[in-house]
């Protein structure tokens, strides 16, 4: 193994000089710097650029505090590798595969896998048309998820992306019963901590591996932590032949970290200050998240939308890789409708009669039509009032409002905030409920009875309590 010396440290960027008679490390190789002679404390660097004359520029995966010029840097000869296999379940890791959950550390001889890999070849890929039931009405009805598909949860700050992803973990991980991998990329440590203890209490943690590179970590760690989580998921798919659920919160932070790294490496920025390699980096990550003939990875990714602007290059680049999108809308949070999923902006390639069935498709398209017509009439209502509408339009508006409220429901993970029990609604019940609302069966019940309930039977019960 070749070794060099540190010649410059600029924040998370470390320049290392190797003598010209040695071979230089390959790009993406892991290099190690020991902070003291006992070799107890080390910093891992990743090769990013060759500057010429034997000098390479690296990105640190940890804080560079304590590094000095002249320190020895050892090339490991391979990329960062992380533990994989059944022993990772129930544990929490950082970007380097070190355990951070106060449990015992992994043995040195544990099976490990490199985080940089090629995506599966075209002939290995497999597609599925099986629906993944989430128990969340608005998703199951209007933008259903496919097993082995890729889903994006889009939304600005504070509209409920993380709560929605936690409810999906609660519902799918418990119902699905398979293996899950949760990757926290550049988000709040507090949320990760809450999620860990919640999963521990529910017992889901025994079938889940968790990987965190939170917002206080260097950009190198935030940029690579998604690959660490994906590597663990790929092993379960390819070697164990499992169907894996991969949750990533938040893909935007992966892009943001890449932007920071790109600037530190001296690359010319592209549109809106993003890295010129944005599409390439996103493609390298997303193309590995796929289903093969051996097993599947169903991924659910939260994607922050800066300033609620969907044309921003970061969410727009991620958009192209997804099978289904769940768009969260701030206007709905202002109306107190949770989850604040926009039923007209959200979409799914699975909403087709040959996949979901004729009745489901018919009810879903009718719901979209009613909501679209209601949106068009809102300007008239705001200016001239309800009296200017025809009798037919008044009935449509009345049903549209009931549909809109019925798309909301209480979450199990939000029970501590709302004081109301969460609900899991099977797809058949969801379709039945909306069909009966559209038929006018519940026109005599108050709109308020439809808000934040599960099944249609719960609406009737709530109406009785309200005195109807």
UniProtKB/Swiss-Prot annotation:
It catalyses: ATP + H2O + 4 H(+)(in) = ADP + phosphate + 5 H(+)(out). It comes from the Bacteria. It is found in: Cell membrane. Its main location: membrane. Its EC number is 7.1.2.2. Gene3D superfamilies: 2.40.10.170, Bovine Mitochondrial F1-atpase, Atp Synthase Beta Chain, Chain D, domain 3, P-loop containing nucleotide triphosphate hydrolases. GO terms for molecular function: ATP binding; ATP hydrolysis activity; proton-transporting ATP synthase activity, rotational mechanism. It holds the Pfam family ATP-synt_ab_N. Keywords: ATP synthesis, ATP-binding, Cell membrane, CF(1), Hydrogen ion transport, Ion transport, Membrane, Nucleotide-binding, Translocase, Transport. ATP binds at residues 155-162. CDD domains: ATP-synt_F1_beta_C, ATP-synt_F1_beta_N, F1-ATPase_beta_CD. InterPro entries: AAA+_ATPase, ATP-synt_VA_C, ATP_synth_F1_bsu, ATPase_a/bsu_AS, ATPase_alpha/beta_chains, ATPase_F1/V1/A1_a/bsu_N, ATPase_F1/V1/A1_a/bsu_N_sf, ATPase_F1/V1/A1_a/bsu_nucl-bd. It is a peripheral membrane protein. The keyword Acetylation does not apply. One of its GO terms (cellular component) is proton-transporting ATP synthase complex. F-type ATPases have 2 components, CF(1) - the catalytic core - and CF(0) - the membrane proton channel. CF(1) has five subunits: alpha(3), beta(3), gamma(1), delta(1), epsilon(1). CF(0) has three main subunits: a(1), b(2) and c(9-12). The alpha and beta chains form an alternating ring which encloses part of the gamma chain. CF(1) is attached to CF(0) by a central stalk formed by the gamma and epsilon chains, while a peripheral stalk is formed by the delta and b chains. Produces ATP from ADP in the presence of a proton gradient across the membrane. The catalytic sites are hosted primarily by the beta subunits. PANTHER family: ATP SYNTHASE, ATP SYNTHASE SUBUNIT BETA, MITOCHONDRIAL. Belongs to the ATPase alpha/beta chains family. This is ATP synthase subunit beta.
């Amino acid at each position: 193994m070749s070794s060099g010396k540190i010649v410059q440290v600029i924040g998370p960027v470390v320049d290392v000089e190797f003598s010209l008679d040695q071979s230089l490390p390959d790009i993406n190789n892991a290099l190690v710097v020991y902070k003291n002679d006992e070799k107890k404390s080390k910093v891992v660097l990743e090769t990013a650029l060759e500057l010429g004359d034997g000098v390479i520029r690296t990105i640190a995966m940890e804080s560079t505090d304590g590094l000095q010029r002249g320190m020895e840097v050892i090339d490991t000869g391979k990329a960062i590798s992380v533990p994989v296999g059944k022993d990772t379940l129930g544990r929490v890791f950082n970007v380097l595969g070190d355990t951070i959950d106060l449990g015992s550390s992994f043995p040195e001889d544990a099976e490990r896998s490199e985080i940089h890999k090629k995506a599966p070849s075209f002939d290995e890929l497999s597609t599925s048309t099986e629906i993944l039931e989430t128990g969340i009405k608005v998703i199951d009805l209007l933008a259903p998820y496919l097993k082995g598909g890729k889903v994006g949860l889009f939304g600005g700050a504070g509209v409920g992306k993380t709560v929605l992803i936690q409810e999906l973990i609660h519902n799918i991980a418990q119902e699905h019963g398979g293996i899950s991998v949760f990757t926290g990329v550049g988000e709040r440590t507090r949320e990760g901590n809450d999620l860990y203890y919640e999963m521990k209490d529910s017992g889901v943690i025994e079938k889940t591996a968790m990987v965190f590179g939170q917002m206080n970590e260097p950009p190198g760690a935030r940029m690579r932590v998604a690959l660490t989580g994906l590597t663990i998921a790929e092993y379960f798919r390819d070697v164990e032949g499992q169907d894996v659920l991969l949750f990533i919160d938040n893909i935007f932070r992966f892009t943001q970290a890449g932007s920071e790294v790109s600037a530190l490496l001296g690359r010319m920025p592209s549109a809106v200050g993003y890295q010129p390699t944005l599409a390439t980096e996103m493609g390298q990550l997303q193309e590995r998240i796929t289903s093969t003939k051996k097993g599947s990875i169903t991924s659910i990714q939260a994607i922050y939308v800066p300033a609620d602007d969907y044309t921003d290059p970061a969410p727009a680049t991620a958009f192209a890789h997804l099978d289904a999108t769940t768009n969260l809308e701030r206007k709905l949070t202002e109306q107190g409708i949770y989850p604040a999923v926009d039923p007209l902006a959200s979409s799914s390639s699975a909403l087709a009669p040959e996949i979901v069935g004729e009745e489901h498709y018919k009810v879903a398209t009718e719901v979209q039509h009613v909501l679209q017509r209601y949106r068009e009439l809102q300007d008239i209502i705001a200016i001239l009032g309800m009296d200017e509408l025809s009798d037919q339009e008044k009935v449509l508006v009345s049903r549209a409002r009931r549909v809109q409220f019925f798309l909301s429901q209480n979450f199990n993970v939000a029970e501590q905030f709302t004081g109301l029990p969460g609900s899991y609604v099977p797809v058949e019940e969801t379709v039945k409920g909306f069909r009966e609302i559209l038929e006018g069966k519940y026109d005599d019940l108050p709109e308020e009875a439809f808000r934040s309930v599960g099944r249609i039977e719960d609406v009737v019960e709530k109406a009785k309590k309200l005195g109807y």
